[in-house]
């Protein structure tokens, strides 16, 4: 009956149907190759699969209790308890650029309470998905507004720096950093490579506690690096993933970046709270761009809003609320004096 109603065309469809011929007319993804494991996270996956009772996980930089269990900082626990007591607690969407109060507190942590840049309103900052999200946001911004510019990254570096630029389609190269023979900073090689980079390149610098070497320039060496970057009109991209870990002091660890800012060099800054707040799974960070005028900040923020909207729409709220609470009275004093890992690290150094 169906064939009589549809006519001859139905017979043709039946006879030439791919299913009838043992063929498939849609993608099956059988040719997709398996990707290699992430160099860091992949080791953790192997740890989870290992059945040995003697195994020890040192693959991911995360705080653990003496029993090797995940640890939440006391100040973060107190912050979350305070959040639950708030009468206006909500889980609403944040704007693309994030929570305004959180952003202001993060800016002060990076640039300082008395920053002239912040007082002048010339720092554009957006909340991001931790440091990795900040790096990707910066790369996407570069792809739109700094086409053809190359990012110069230290050799060695955190491996994901390279892959983020690759995935975003941003060209990158490397400058010398580690002197293997002397087990210290290869300052001469670093300066030579930065000076050889085309004028107006983007130089990525680790703000403190260089990953993976742990070797940071001295104050005098930072001055030499800054002089070359200024002479070549480079944009300096500070990745601040470990603020407080190098010296135990948040302000001291931001000294180099603040000096570059005070000198008027254009900056990108990626900030992460995964390590120094132990908020690994909350994905809390920021991305900042220093500008010449408040009007330029408005334009830059509008473009960051668009990029964020099309990457992940808007950032998560809970982790930012926790950071905001810890950086605000009275928890800021509690964190500084009692439970902050930075305090404990400084205490060990003092002993």
Which residues fall in each region the model found?
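N-terminal mitochondrial targeting presequence
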Residues: 1-26
């Amino acid at each position: 009956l169906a064939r009589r109603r549809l006519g001859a065309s139905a017979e043709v469809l039946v006879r030439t149907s791919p299913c009838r011929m043992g063929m498939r007319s849609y993608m099956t993804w059988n040719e997709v190759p398996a990707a290699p494991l992430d160099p860091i996270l992949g080791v953790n996956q192997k740890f989870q699969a290992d059945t040995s009772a003697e195994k020890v996980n040192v693959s991911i930089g995360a705080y653990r209790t003496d029993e090797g269990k995940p640890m939440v900082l006391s100040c973060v626990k107190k912050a979350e308890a305070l959040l639950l007591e708030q009468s206006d607690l909500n889980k609403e969407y944040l704007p693309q650029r994030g929570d305004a109060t959180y952003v202001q507190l993060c800016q002060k942590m990076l640039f300082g309470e008395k920053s002239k840049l912040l007082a002048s309103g010339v720092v554009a900052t957006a909340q991001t998905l931790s440091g990795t999200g900040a790096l990707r946001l910066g790369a996407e911004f570069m792809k739109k507004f700094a086409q053809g510019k190359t990012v110069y990254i230290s050799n060695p570096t955190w491996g994901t720096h390279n892959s983020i630029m690759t995935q975003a389609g941003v060209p990158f190269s490397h400058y010398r950093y580690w002197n293997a023979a002397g087990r210290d900073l290869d300052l001469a090689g670093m300066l030579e490579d930065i000076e050889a980079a085309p004028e107006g390149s983007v130089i990525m610098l680790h703000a403190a506690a260089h990953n993976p070497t742990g070797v940071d320039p001295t104050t005098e060496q930072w001055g030499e690096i800054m002089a070359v970057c200024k002479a070549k009109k480079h944009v300096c991209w500070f990745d601040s993933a470990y603020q407080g870990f190098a010296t135990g002091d948040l302000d001291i660890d931001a000294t180099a970046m603040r000096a570059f800012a005070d000198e008027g060099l254009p900056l990108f800054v990626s900030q992460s709270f995964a390590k120094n707040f132990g908020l690994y799974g909350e994905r809390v960070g920021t991305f900042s761009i220093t500008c010449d005028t408040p009007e330029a900040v408005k334009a830059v923020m509008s473009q960051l809003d668009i990029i964020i909207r099309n990457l992940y729409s808007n950032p998560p709220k809970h982790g930012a609320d926790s950071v905001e609470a810890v950086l605000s009275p009275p928890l800021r004093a509690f964190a500084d004096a009692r439970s902050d890992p930075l305090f404990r690290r400084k205490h060990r150094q003092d002993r």
